[in-house]
């Protein structure tokens, strides 16, 4: 009888120990949700987590990006060529018209993700054309990848035999996120589970079941989107869409107790763009100076003022450049400290 009882006690103690360990593990598990409109930079943040908190990209993984990079480069020059017609811009050299026609034809016939020499030569000639450059300067009037200039101006390096993509090449590459991508890593004694969710409208209905037990939401908005329209709807300004989405998330009853951090991303693109395009394009009431600081701060205030519970709930915001590893490392470190502080506060230890 006694032996049976002590075995039961032992089993009970083991179970208690296991439950305690599980509870501690749960307390140290951080569920992070990356939300934001399409092309705001969510997937680039995920790539940075791999670089900063995992072991980065192996040679094999880098090589897998070549096809994506070539595909992005081709799509970018094709978008510019098509816009030449729509915007009625003349080529600086009329011979480029033939190059453009040849390129359109080749794009339909080559194997996807490859870059034959004849094609890269044509692309390089087109990119140097003054008409193409004038069209590139008007990129906000049509849909063009942010990485267009980065790849097109460096195409010679990208097509060198034996080319291996650099971390920056990988970070700049773009594949539309469909569905939900989970990344796991450890940092500051916490186990992170980060979920990247497709941002375009058709993808958003998949978010809802991710909402259970979220520790922190990182909402990403592209600062540079103030003069752009949606891929899905060319009547809707991207910044307005982003504000609308942020409003519905930060005031959602699901997230009443969830920490929310706002990344105002693409500050590098924004700092160049604001020199040329006035913020009043997006916010007609804005009559402040058209500088990076003033315009950037005005955008930040537009987001933060949407928080209906700002008397009790603080939303932390950061200006970010998702392709800059040091910047992301610094900001994510600050976010982690916020998460630790908020979690300790919840446990009554802070």
Swiss-Prot record:
Region entry G1 motif, spans: 31-44
The keyword Isomerase appears for this protein: no
Main location: other
GO BP term (any one): negative regulation of cyclic-nucleotide phosphodiesterase activity
Bilayer topology annotation: Peripheral membrane protein
Subcellular location(s) per record: Cell projection, Cilium, Photoreceptor outer segment; Membrane; Photoreceptor inner segment
Domain of life assignment: Eukaryota
Region ranges (G5 motif): 320-325
Annotated segments matching region Disordered: 1-21
Reported tissue expression: Rod.
Disulfide links within the chain: none
Lipidation (N-myristoyl glycine): 2
Region (G4 motif): 261-268
Modified-residue entries (Phosphotyrosine), positions: 142
Identification of the protein by name: Guanine nucleotide-binding protein G(t) subunit alpha-1
Organism whose genome encodes this protein: Bos taurus (Bovine)
Gene: GNAT1
């Amino acid at each position: 009888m006694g032996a049976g009882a002590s075995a039961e006690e032992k089993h009970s103690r083991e179970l208690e120990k296991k439950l305690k360990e599980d509870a501690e593990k749960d307390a140290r598990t951080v569920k992070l949700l990356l939300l934001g409109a399409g092309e705001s930079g969510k997937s680039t943040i995920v790539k940075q987590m791999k670089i900063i908190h995992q072991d980065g990209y192996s040679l094999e993984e880098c090589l897998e990006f070549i096809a994506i990079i070539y595909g992005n480069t081709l799509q970018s020059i094709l978008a510019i060529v098509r816009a030449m017609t729509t915007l009625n811009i003349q080529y600086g050299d009329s011979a480029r018209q033939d190059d453009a026609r040849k390129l359109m034809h080749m794009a339909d016939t080559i194997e996807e993700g490859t870059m034959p020499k004849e094609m890269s030569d044509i692309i390089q000639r087109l990119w140097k054309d003054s008409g193409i450059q004038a069209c590139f300067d008007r990129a906000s009037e049509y849909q063009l990848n942010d990485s267009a200039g980065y790849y097109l101006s460096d195409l010679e390096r990208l097509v060198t035999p034996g080319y291996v993509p650099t971390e920056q090449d990988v970070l700049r590459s773009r594949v539309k996120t469909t569905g939900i991508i989970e990344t796991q890593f450890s940092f500051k004694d916490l186990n992170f589970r980060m979920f990247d969710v497709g941002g375009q409208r058709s993808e958003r209905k998949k978010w809802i079941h991710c909402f259970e037990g979220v520790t922190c939401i990182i909402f990403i908005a592209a600062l540079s989107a103030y003069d752009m329209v949606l891929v899905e709807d060319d009547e809707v300004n991207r910044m307005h869409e982003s504000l609308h989405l942020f409003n519905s998330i930060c005031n959602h009853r699901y997230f009443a107790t969830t920490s929310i951090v706002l990344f105002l991303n693409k500050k590098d693109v924004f700092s160049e763009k604001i020199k040329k395009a006035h913020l009043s394009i997006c916010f007609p009431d804005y009559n402040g100076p058209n500088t990076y600081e003033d315009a950037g701060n005005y955008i930040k205030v537009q987001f933060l003022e949407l928080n209906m519970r700002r008397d009790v709930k603080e939303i932390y915001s950061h200006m970010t450049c998702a392709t800059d590893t040091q910047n992301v490392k610094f900001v994510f470190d600050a976010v982690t400290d916020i998460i630790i502080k908020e979690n300790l506060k919840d446990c009554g230890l802070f």
